[in-house]
A protein has these predicted regions:
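Conserved active-site and SAM-binding loop architecture
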Residues: 1-197
Length: 198
């Protein structure tokens, strides 16, 4: 498959260089397990829909799923051709679309993010493409947070944002455990991932 020069124009990826690492939080709404309920016509919101309404909506969802699948695959192809490693984050479940229908397998699966300093359990998978995850041992106490669940947040003003938030402590540990070379030391507050050599 030959990709056009990013649809004939400039690309975000033109600004990346070898030595950079892309961390992609790719939209999950069409890959995650809840989409299966919609495809089967069993989502609560579809309770009073006609079969024709369900089919029309499912065709629209399938187009969106296909679009996202093409985008994530094209992104990886472009980055691989440029020699730029990428780490992709998405929810984990055995029914997740990419888990079952993508030729690249995740290299890190975190089944309980709360255990390593996040606000929620949220099982998450990470694809390390063009880079191998490190296996650094972090010998320090986890800064546990009050555990939240999506159901606790439902109906709040910023529900959509809050359910996607990741705590600084979780990110700090993840970077030091899986991305940064050498002896892992706590990352200082004013530094970011961009301040570290990979």
């Amino acid at each position: 498959m030959k990709l056009k020069k990013r649809m004939g124009g400039e690309s975000l990826f033109d600004t990346f260089n070898k030595g950079d690492v892309v961390m992609a939080f790719f939209p999950c709404t069409r890959f995650e397990v809840q989409i299966l309920l919609w495809f089967r016509g069993e989502a609560m919101q579809q309770k009073n829909w006609s079969e024709a309404d369900k089919l029309e909506y499912c065709m629209k969802l399938h187009d969106e799923l296909h679009r996202n699948y093409m985008l994530i695959s094209k992104m990886v192809i472009v980055l691989q051709k440029r020699g730029i490693p990428v780490i992709i984050e998405n929810p984990y479940s055995t029914q997740h679309y990419l888990t079952n229908y993508w030729c690249i397998k995740p290299k890190v699966i975190d089944k309980d993010r709360h255990a390593t300093g996040d606000y929620m359990k949220k099982p998450t998978q990470y694809w390390f493409i063009g880079i191998e995850p490190k296996d650094n041992l972090i010998m320090e106490q986890v800064n546990y947070k009050k555990r939240l669940s999506v159901s606790n947040l439902f109906g709040t003003k910023d529900y959509v944002v809050q359910r996607s938030m990741i705590s600084k402590d979780y990110v700090n540990r993840f970077i030091r455990e899986f991305i940064v070379d050498g002896e892992p030391k706590p990352i200082e507050e004013e530094k970011t991932l961009f301040d570290y050599e990979v």
